[in-house]
């Protein structure tokens, strides 16, 4: 009897201990489940906030970011030949600069565009500095051997304007090597801040509308017939549709640099096709972006 009672007490104790352990384990599991649920909710909220932040279109605030800028005045010795003209000095200047927008991907994109070399491949900042220093040293050597008025190679980026998700930049370039004057120009960059990509000519225009596009540009070039074809700087056959363009409130601006369709004295030329006039030439995908309204000639 005593032995049976002891066995019963042991079993009761075991069940009691096991029951307590089950309750504690259950409580622990419930607490862990709540913690996991809370962390999951917080993670989802952070992900949502991040996605919203990424969709926010930043306002561009651009500052010059000089990569290389060096200049000096080189004094030339007087020529020993009376009939030979040698300038007393020549100015040497090499510079390249990009922009700092505090938007990392945009800064990288702009640097890649301004750093492209002859084969179209972008160079690193370090490579640019090395290349410009080498070119500077070679130019200085040439000037000392054959005195000229100067050499100037300038390349920089400028911020033009922004409308929502569209930002427009331009690359300015100027080159002078001792002639009567230097030659400069502009190349525009249209950047979609939402897709983080450059807008190319093919992104904007339908491929089967080239002839119509050329006709519209030619009309504006000749001022709707005011300038006769034979009087134009460029003949109609030689006239080309440039892929150097930018988007603005009044339409699409096609930019022709000096000597392309006008003389040096006349400078760069811009031909504008109004949005309402260009709508039939534009790709549906481009129109869906709604960078600017295209259905009215009073687009803002």
Predicted regions and their residues:
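Compositionally biased intrinsically disordered regions enriched in Thr/Gly
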Residues: 21-300
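Sec-dependent N-terminal signal peptides
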Residues: 6-11
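C-terminal motif of bacterial Sec signal peptides marking the signal peptidase cleavage site
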Residues: 16-19
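Positively charged n-region of N-terminal signal peptides that target proteins for export
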Residues: 1-4
């Amino acid at each position: 009897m005593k032995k049976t009672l002891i066995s019963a007490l042991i079993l009761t104790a075991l069940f009691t201990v096991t029951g307590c352990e089950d309750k504690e384990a259950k409580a622990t599991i419930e607490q862990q489940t709540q913690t996991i649920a809370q962390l999951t909710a917080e993670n989802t909220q952070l992900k949502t906030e991040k996605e919203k932040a990424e969709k926010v279109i930043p306002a561009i605030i651009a500052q010059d970011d000089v990569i290389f800028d060096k200049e000096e005045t080189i004094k030339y010795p007087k020529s020993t030949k009376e009939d030979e003209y040698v300038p007393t000095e020549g100015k040497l200047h090499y510079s390249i600069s990009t922009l700092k927008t505090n938007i990392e991907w945009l800064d990288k994109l702009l640097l890649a565009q301004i750093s492209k070399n002859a084969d179209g491949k972008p160079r690193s900042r370090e490579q640019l500095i090395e290349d410009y220093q080498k070119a500077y040293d070679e130019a200085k050597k040439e000037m000392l051997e054959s005195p000229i008025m100067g050499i100037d190679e300038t390349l920089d980026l400028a911020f033009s304007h922004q409308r929502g998700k569209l930002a427009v930049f331009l690359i300015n370039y100027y080159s002078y090597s001792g002639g009567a004057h230097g030659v400069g120009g502009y190349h525009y960059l249209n950047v979609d801040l939402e897709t983080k990509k450059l807008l190319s000519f093919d992104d904007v225009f339908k491929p089967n509308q080239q002839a119509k596009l050329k006709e519209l540009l030619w009309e504006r070039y000749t001022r709707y017939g005011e300038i006769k074809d034979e009087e134009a700087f460029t003949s109609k056959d030689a006239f080309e549709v440039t892929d150097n363009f930018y988007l603005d409130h009044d339409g699409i601006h096609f930019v022709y640099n000096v000597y392309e369709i006008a003389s040096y004295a006349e400078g760069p030329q811009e031909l504008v096709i109004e949005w309402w006039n260009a709508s039939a030439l534009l790709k549906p995908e481009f129109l869906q972006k709604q960078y600017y309204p295209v259905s009215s000639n009073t687009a803002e």
